[in-house]
Every structure is written in structure tokens, then in C-alpha cells.
Design a protein with these regions (language model features):
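Active-site core segments that coordinate phosphate-bearing ligands/cofactors
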Residues: 1-10, 14-54, 64-84, 98-100, ...
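N-terminal low-complexity or amphipathic/hydrophobic leaders
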Residues: 56-59
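A conserved helix-loop-beta module that forms one wall/lid of the active-site cleft
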Residues: 82-94
Length: 385
């Protein structure tokens, strides 16, 4: 419980603290010789010309080694692992801070002009949040790409009593992001395409179309609930609000009458239900969500966007710039070199192009399908996973 309160993290083997514990146990000689414990982005910054090893506030706060509320490395956690704080990169709280300049050697290798400022960015998902204009309390950013996540900006460092959510500093904005992740998200849809849709890929190539457009047309012929088919989207274990590395992807409910359209719709719905788990966990913890902005490949599908609006019961806003992460990183640099006064001014660059409004007529059908999704998971978790 203290871990969840101080470090605002779920217990997860992917985090830095778990990897450091493994390294200390299994490679003691390398551990003894280590002069600095650094993340890869800190190392790259130094190689490009930063004058020291630096890490940004959002990246530092996600690894279970930082006291997030006090905005510093946790001496307690470092003492547990036997790491002197002098062996850590310096935490930078100022958005886009200039930490060095491109020198001659790096310029020759990279093509970047000598003297180009090197600015601190942020964790990739925080760059995405910033690029989506999420700087104020109540704005959520849903990333539906290879990896899925839902970030909600909050003025309060809220703790989830069930310890399903992560709290991080919202770099440069003076507040926090409350978040959770899906290990697959749109990767499950890509898996379905590559495993079951050779014909659609061939037809798309001949017609000069995207295979996903053909699959989406099929999905539109299947009703809400996919004619009773449920797909658990846990092809790399369950993330999000369930945190179960042993969970697996599953189709349940197929009959001789099941069509590919039903299976495809079940996959799309299953991905949405896993993300809905996260949104429900965030709202159950007292976090308000006023609007959801969508980034990632799923934003290209009107069918999928409307499905999310109906399942989440929130409007879904589509960003003008689909590469929100790249935009966010550029905006941090803009703040750092003085092109913008602060993050709030920089965030005004963001624009939304379309909004999908929830259709209340579809709530009951999706709620029933979501309940079945939860029931299938619970049954398999007890006996199979």
C-alpha cells in the first residue's frame, strides 16, 4: 500500500525498479561497476551534447523510483536497492529546458547545425498528451495504436484504492496525468487482419484500397454485440484495469453461423471494452472526464470512433494532427527556446477536426456486450488463466 501511495505505481515487472532488482541479483559484477543508472533517452541526450545526464519529470515519475508528490528521487526506494542518488540523472522539471547544444562532431554525423539547442522532451505518452492539447483538468487523451493508453489530466494526485492506475507528473503543466495501459489495443486488429484476411489484403491491393477499409465494411454488417461473439483482446496479457500477465486472447460464442464480419466486429469491440475498463477505473476513482481526444490509427476509422463514443458514453474528438506525440515533443522544444511563453500557450496550437457524439440508442446493447466481456474474463480467470 505504501508503494502505491508514494510511488503512485502499479506493481509491474516492466518498470525500472523491477529491472534494477533483477540486474542486482543476476549480474552482481556489472552492478558493482555501474557508475550511473540511466534510461536510454537520458543516454541519447548526453551523446547528442547535453552537458550532463538529465531526465524529465514525466519519465522519472513512471518508473517506481520517484516520490511523485514531492517531485524528487525517492531515497527510500534507492536505499532498498542500494543505489546512491549521486548515480542518477538530474530530474528536469522545466518544460523544454535547453540542456546543451549540438557540437561539430554530432553535426557531421547527424546533419544538425552546430549550435542547435538540445531541449528536454518528456515521456512519449506525455508528449502525446501535450500534443493533443491536454493541459487542463478533465481532458482525457486516448491513444489507440500498437499500444493503448488513456491519460486524464487532473489537478489532484489521485490514488486508485484498487491500485489499477498510474499517477505521473504532467510535465510542464503544473498538474498530473492519471493513466493506465492496454498491452495490445490496435495491435489486436492488425493481428486479425494478418491472420484471417489474406483475401481482403489481395482485393485491397487490386482496388488500390486499404485492407482495413474493406474489413470495416464487413464489420458494419454485423450488429452490436457481434451476434454473440466475445473477443478478449489480451494477446500480450491483460493490462489496463486488470493487470494479468497470464491472461490470453480468446474468441467465445462461435457457431456454424458465425461470419468473418462477426469475428472482426468482436475484435474491434473487445479492444474498446478493454479501454472502457480503464475509463471506468479512472471515473470510479473520482477523476472527472469532460472530453476524450483520440490519437493513433483507430482515429482513421469513423466506424471505430463512433463505437468508442457509444461504449464510453463520451464525445470523441479527432485531432487535426494525427502525430500528437511528435507535435508534443516539438511544442516542448518551442517552450524551451522561447517560441511560446509556457505550455498553456503552446497547447493552443492543437486543433480538433471532428467530434463523434454518443448515441444513447446504442447504450443498452453495448452495455450487455460489455457485461458478457467481463463475465467471460472472470470465468476464464478462475479456471484457465
Amino acid at each position: 500500500n505504501r508503494y502505491a501511495v508514494v510511488f503512485t505505481k502499479i506493481v509491474d515487472v516492466t518498470l525500472e525498479n523491477a529491472k534494477l532488482a533483477w540486474l542486482k541479483l543476476h549480474e552482481p559484477e556489472n552492478w558493482k561497476k555501474t557508475a550511473l543508472f540511466s534510461t536510454m533517452q537520458d543516454y541519447f541526450l548526453k551523446q547528442f551534447g547535453a552537458d550532463d545526464y538529465y531526465t524529465d519529470y514525466s519519465s522519472a515519475s513512471r518508473e517506481g523510483m520517484m516520490d511523485v508528490d514531492n517531485e524528487c528521487w525517492s531515497k527510500e526506494m534507492h536505499d532498498i536497492l542500494g543505489i546512491d542518488l549521486s548515480k542518477r540523472a538530474k530530474i528536469v522539471k522545466e518544460p523544454g529546458k535547453v540542456v546543451g547544444h549540438i557540437g561539430k562532431e554530432v553535426s557531421e554525423k547527424s546533419g544538425l547545425p552546430v549550435g542547435t539547442p538540445i531541449c528536454m522532451g518528456a515521456h512519449d505518452q506525455n508528449c502525446c498528451t501535450f500534443g493533443a492539447g491536454a493541459v487542463d483538468d478533465g481532458t482525457a487523451v486516448l491513444v489507440m495504436g500498437t499500444f493503448g493508453s488513456c491519460f486524464v489530466v487532473s489537478d489532484k494526485s489521485i490514488r486508485d484504492p484498487k491500485e489499477r492506475l498510474v499517477v505521473k507528473g504532467n510535465h510542464g503543466c503544473g498538474n498530473f496525468t492519471i493513466e493506465a495501459f492496454s498491452n495490445t489495443a490496435a495491435s489486436s486488429y492488425r493481428w486479425y487482419r494478418d491472420t484471417f484476411c489474406d483475401y481482403e489484403k489481395l482485393m485491397a491491393k487490386e482496388q488500390g484500397e486499404d485492407p482495413y477499409d474493406l474489413i470495416n465494411k464487413q464489420i458494419a454488417t454485423s450488429p452490436i454485440g457481434a451476434n454473440g461473439i466475445t473477443f478478449l483482446s489480451f494477446l500480450q496479457g491483460a493490462g489496463g484495469a486488470r493487470i494479468n500477465g497470464k491472461a490470453r486472447g480468446t474468441f467465445v460464442g462461435m457457431t456454424l453461423g458465425t461470419r468473418k464480419a462477426d469475428m472482426a466486429r468482436a475484435v474491434m469491440e473487445g479492444i474498446c471494452y478493454e479501454m472502457y475498463d480503464i475509463i471506468r477505473a479512472e471515473e470510479d476513482s473520482g477523476i472527472k472526464i469532460d472530453k476524450i481526444r483520440l490519437a493513433g490509427g483507430a482515429a482513421k476509422s469513423p466506424l471505430w470512433c463512433q463505437m468508442m463514443a457509444d461504449i464510453f458514453k463520451h464525445p470523441i474528438q479527432i485531432l487535426e494532427n494525427g502525430e500528437a506525440g511528435c507535435l508534443g515533443a516539438a511544442l516542448y522544444a518551442g517552450v524551451g527556446v522561447g517560441a511560446y511563453k509556457d505550455c498553456h500557450e503552446a497547447a493552443k496550437v492543437d486543433r480538433t477536426t471532428k467530434e463523434y457524439t454518443p448515441n444513447p440508442d446504442n447504450y443498452a446493447a453495448y452495455d450487455a456486450a460489455y457485461k458478457r466481456f467481463c463475465d467471460v474474463y472472470d470465468a476464464l480467470d478462475k479456471k484457465i488463466f
